[in-house]
């Protein structure tokens, strides 16, 4: 049975996009597919969130876009990480690791006796 869909916490979509693109360049639909595939359908992103995020990341200089032929033979905008995009991803991962580590400590805390 597939996992139920989970809303992406605010502020994490950019990090997830950067991570997917660190694996290989992809077009928007391919990014959405990889997110869903890797997360076993828990993470699903709609176009209304994905494309504004891609535009924002490109404006910040973290992505570059090139028009290429897709698997279907149609032209598509393929995104890839820039050097500053890789640097930003490392920073985002470090922050995420610190936060999730702190949350884990809080969850693991036992009641006072």
Where are these regions (language model features)?
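Accessory beta->alpha helical hairpin/"wing" motif in late/C-terminal subdomains of nucleic-acid enzymes
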Residues: 81-85
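N-terminal helix-turn-helix DNA-binding core of bacterial DNA-binding proteins
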Residues: 5-49
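Basic amphipathic alpha-helical segments that dock to polyanions
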Residues: 50-57
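Short beta-strand/turn micro-motifs at beta-sheet edges
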Residues: 3-7, 67-68
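A positively charged, amphipathic N-terminal helix/segment that binds anionic biomolecules
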Residues: 1-3, 79
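Beta-hairpin "wing" of winged helix-turn-helix
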Residues: 58-74, 80
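Amphipathic alpha-helical dimerization/coiled-coil segments
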Residues: 86-113
């Amino acid at each position: 049975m597939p996992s139920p869909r989970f809303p992406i916490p605010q502020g994490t979509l950019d990090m997830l996009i950067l991570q997917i693109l660190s694996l290989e360049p992809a077009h928007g639909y391919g990014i959405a597919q990889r997110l869903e595939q890797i997360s076993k359908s828990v993470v699903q992103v709609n176009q209304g969130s994905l494309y504004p995020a891609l535009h924002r990341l490109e404006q910040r200089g973290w992505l570059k876009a090139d028009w290429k032929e897709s698997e279907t033979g149609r032209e598509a905008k393929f995104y890839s990480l820039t050097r500053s995009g890789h640097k930003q991803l490392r920073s985002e991962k470090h922050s995420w690791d610190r936060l999730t580590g702190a949350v884990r400590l809080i969850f693991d805390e036992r009641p006072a006796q």
